A protein has these predicted regions:
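Juxtamembrane membrane-water interface segments that cap and precede transmembrane helices
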Residues: 24-38, 162-177
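N-terminal signal-anchor transmembrane segment
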Residues: 1-60, 85-89
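Alpha-helical transmembrane segments of multi-pass inner-membrane proteins
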Residues: 81-87, 126-159, 166-170, 175-241
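A membrane-periplasm/extracellular boundary helix in multi-pass inner-membrane enzymes
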Residues: 141, 147-150, 235-275
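Membrane-interfacial loop-to-transmembrane alpha-helix junctions, especially the N-terminal start
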Residues: 6-17, 64-78, 125-132, 203-204
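Membrane-embedded alpha-helical segments of multi-pass membrane proteins
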Residues: 38-57, 100-110, 183-192, 225-232
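Membrane-interface helix-boundary motifs at transmembrane edges
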Residues: 59-70, 117-128, 198-203, 240-249
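Aromatic-anchored transmembrane helix interface
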Residues: 72-79, 93-115, 131, 136
Length: 275
């Protein structure tokens, strides 16, 4: 009974993590300590900590298997060395240390999520995939709504800071509940690639279209670069290993349509603000 309860809690925590990446900033409260205004604790961070704590038994159970994974250990070791060197040479060591701890925490949550996912049944894995697809669809629609509202009426919802309006940047900056557009675009990448690999799902096609629109509305170079590099790498791997990548080529028109539609919305918003 207790094991089933723990497994259910793990599943729902992972579902929230997958769906709620766009809520990385709000709702949250700022911690006015260490002269670090960006230090905040929010609902999403609490869920992430809970996921990490509930995964500890799995980490202990599979510790031998994890320690034998050279790529995993080598990757963590390289990151740890880079962080140590970075802190040593940084001018603001405390701030660099806090950012570094955030990165390590993110990696630990990713490892925990992977372990929990590997323990799920096929039906629950399918449910999580659908959660990710719905995340892309919902946040894509919300991004369009934010753009529309910010175009016709300046609003504080989801803006970067007080006074960060469309008339300052020239067009609305779409970030919804994330700290900035770049972070919002990054939070949509899991939904984007989930939709890309679901070849026979109508939900996946809608999710891919609206996720692409949302990423284009952020005007995030990092988001565009991540998608371009990942798709290029997939085609190279498929060519070298002679893997059928036709399902990716079939999704490219959806991606291009989403980008064009998103840029058209941004252009229309810019013209509206000028008028």
């Amino acid at each position: 009974m207790a094991k089933k309860y723990i497994n259910d809690v793990r599943f729902w925590l992972l579902a929230i993590i997958i769906f709620g990446g766009g809520f990385a900033l709000h709702p949250s409260v700022g911690l006015s300590i260490l002269d670090f205004p960006s230090l905040r604790v929010g609902l999403y961070q609490i869920v992430a900590v809970s996921l990490l704590l509930f995964s500890l038994p799995l980490l202990l159970k599979k510790r031998q298997e994890l320690l034998k994974n050279r790529w995993l250990i080598g990757g963590f070791l390289a990151i740890f060395i880079a962080i140590t060197v970075g802190i040593f040479f940084a001018e603001a060591r405390l701030r660099t240390a806090l950012y570094s701890l955030s990165l390590l925490f993110l990696l630990a949550v990713g490892l925990s999520a992977g372990l929990i996912y590997s323990e799920l049944s096929k039906s629950k894995k399918r449910k999580l995939i659908n959660v990710g697809l719905w995340s892309g669809l919902v946040f894509g629609i919300l991004a369009i709504i934010q753009l529309t509202v910010a175009t016709f009426e300046p609003t504080g919802l989801g803006t970067l800071c007080a006074g960060c309006k469309a008339d300052v940047f020239g067009f609305p900056r779409i970030n919804l509940f994330a700290a900035e557009p770049q972070f919002f675009a990054n939070s949509l990448l899991p939904a984007f690639f989930l939709a890309l690999f679901q070849s026979k799902s109508r939900l996946a096609k809608f999710s891919l279209f609206f996720t692409t629109i949302a990423i284009s509305l952020t005007f995030s170079r990092g988001g565009f670069l991540s998608i371009f590099i990942a798709i290029t790498a997939l085609f190279i791997i498929a060519f070298v290993k002679r893997i059928d990548a036709s399902f990716i080529r079939k999704k490219l028109p959806i991606i291009f349509a989403g980008l064009l539609f998103g840029f058209a919305l941004l252009f229309s918003s810019d013209r509206k603000s000028v008028v």
